Amino acid sequence: MERQPFQLDDTIKNNVRTYLQQISTEASNLIKHLDTSDHCILCDFEEMRKLFQDVQATAASYYLRHYLSPYTFEYAALSLAIHNLSEKRHGALIVIEREQNVDPLIQKGMPIQAPVSATLVETLFYPGTPLHDGAVLIRNNQLISAANVLPLSSIISTTKKIGTRHRAAIGMSEKSDALILVVSEETGKISFALDGSLYPIHSSKNMI
């Protein structure tokens, strides 16, 4: 699936530019430290890794809103819900339907048919409640259903462990153009899946 390009605004350009300048500085320092016998370059690599993660998450947060904006107006509600779920480390899996109907791809759970709200999303994913397992489906500005079962990705990562929620998010994005939000219950980290790839994003109340 080909993604439509869009113009970056000045704020995101400046943020990314700042990160890239920091990465460039760290890389230059690393080159200098190669000839220093008493310097551990692993620390430099770790700092660069963190900077790369931060710049990717910053860019992904920006792109996320643009990927969602044509399909739902409920950015604020979703942002608040995802942020609060992340803070509490409550796992979550949210499918936002876009152009393609996803009904044929999921094992349907419990019908909800209610307007999207942060409170409703957080309640559905509260640990121990009957509907907290599985995925919520959002179509336009409506929360259609909960406890849906998604197709798992057949791709197995050899570099790191991927949990069931993340495999389901990737699997769904491999088979449709849907965008899937994921909150890890182990770390609280937030990511989204699109076109078979998983992208980390920063946690904030206005991330979307």
State what each model feature region is.
Residues M1-I208:
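Divalent-cation
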